[in-house]
Amino acid sequence: MKRIIRKDSNRLSVIAITLALLLMPLQTFASSNYASNHDLAGFKEIKFNLSLSNLKKLGLECGYLTCTNEHRSESLNNLTFLGQPIYYDNNEYNNIFEEGITVWLSDRDNPPRSIHQITFYVRLTGATVSQSLKKNFGNYIRSADWDYWFFKNGAAIATYNPKIGFFPAKTIYYAPDYAKRILKGIMPTWLLEGSTALTLDDY
């Protein structure tokens, strides 16, 4: 008698295998990622918990959505990342890097205002930054040319690392609350909650 194979059974098997394959990168990331064992408080003197007034005391000029180092504050002028000074471009035709460091703030309609992210550039390629961070923090999650490291307290570091050489390297420090949005955008919520290695509860 010819054996009858149920289509429903086959479909469930395919779904189970697909889920296992989808979870593998996330589980590998969590089990071999040193970053998830540490907290990330901010970038150097710029801590995520600083108030708007404290950011101004550091010498940053703050507007509606950002704070920048337009006046070259002495306390921030000599900051380095991976041994390289923060990149300032004084070329009047290329002002995208002029501020060096940009602190992005939460909306004014949501007081008290807090830091969402800290963006800066250094005189390295994106690939060099990514390799250095991998040595320090282990594997990363890669999405749309960005490499991400997520920390125990929910904060994250991302560096732009496309296939073509990108210089100067762009790096972003994400505050915990904002990093949650990034993580959910990279990995679907149901996928994260289904992983025993890393869940949204950790954030």
Where are each of the predicted segments found?
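Bacterial N-terminal signal peptides
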Residues: I15-P25
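Short linear motifs in intrinsically disordered/low-complexity regions
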Residues: S9-R11, L50, N90-N91, N95-I96, ...
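Residues at beta-strand starts and edge strands
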Residues: S13-I15, E99, S114-H116
